[in-house]
Amino acid sequence: MVKKVSRRLRDAQAKVENKAYEPLEALTLLKELATAKFDETAEAHIRLGIDPKYTDQQLRTTVSLPKGTGRTVRVAVITRGEKVQEANNAGADIVGSEELIEEIAKGMMDFEVLIATPDMMPKVAKLGRQLGPRGLMPSPKGGTVTTDLTGAIAEFKAGKLEFRADRTGIVHVQFGKASFSAEDLLVNLKALQETVDRNRPSGAKGRYWRTVYVSSSMGPSIQVDISALRDLKLAEG
C-alpha cells in the first residue's frame, strides 16, 4: 500500500533543498516547518560508519543537553532499604523494590528512565524481555546503574539522555522542542555531536560520520553539513 503523504508535509518538503545546510540554517528551517498544532520534538538522525553486530563497534552512552529536553521526564527507581527514601527525596516519580519489578513484568511502563542500584540488578535482569526492546534496561554505561541516586535522578530530570546506535548504525536522539530558539537547539546538537565523537567505538574503521539529518516530529528531514557542525565553536555561556 502506498503511504499517503499529507499536503502539509508535502508543502514542507518542497521548502527543503537537496543539500547539506549550515547547522544554524538547518535548525531555523526545522522551526519554520514545524507547523503541527502541538510543540513538536526536534530529532537528530545520525548515520555512522559502524557495524553494531561487532561488540567493538557498538555505541551506547549518555549526553547531557545543556538547554534541556523541553519535556518532563518520568524517572522510576528500583532499590531497597534506606535508598528508597533517598530516591523519593530526590524527586523520583516511581520508587519500589521487588513489587515494582513485578509491576513492570506485568506491563507497567509509565516512565522514560529506569534507574537501579547495583544490588537490585540480578532481579532487574529478568525484565529483559520488557525493558530490552524499549532501551530501558539499566546499565552502568548509561548511568542508570548507580548508588548515587540523588545525582542520577537530578541529571536525567535536567536533560541527560541515554542513546545508542541501532543495528544499522544509526543514532536517533530527541534534542529539544521546536519552540526552542534555533541557537538553543544548536547548543544541544553540538553537545550531541561532541558526545558521539568522544565515544567513537574502538573498532570503527574508515569514515565515522556518514550523514546527519534533523527534523521536527511531523516535519521533513533536513540534511546538516557534518564538517560545519564538527568545526563549529560555540561561545561559552
Curated annotation (Swiss-Prot):
One of its GO terms (cellular component) is large ribosomal subunit. InterPro entries: Ribosom_uL1_bac-type (IPR005878), Ribosomal_uL1 (IPR002143), Ribosomal_uL1-like (IPR023674), Ribosomal_uL1/biogenesis (IPR028364), Ribosomal_uL1_3-a/b-sand (IPR016095), Ribosomal_uL1_CS (IPR023673). GO terms for biological process: regulation of translation; translation. Belongs to the universal ribosomal protein uL1 family. The gene is rplA. HAMAP family: Ribosomal_uL1_B. Part of the 50S ribosomal subunit. This is Large ribosomal subunit protein uL1. Binds directly to 23S rRNA. The L1 stalk is quite mobile in the ribosome, and is involved in E site tRNA release. GO terms for molecular function: rRNA binding; structural constituent of ribosome; tRNA binding. Gene3D superfamilies: 3.30.190.20, 3.40.50.790. Pfam families: Ribosomal_L1 (PF00687). Keywords: Repressor, Ribonucleoprotein, Ribosomal protein, RNA-binding, rRNA-binding, Translation regulation, tRNA-binding.
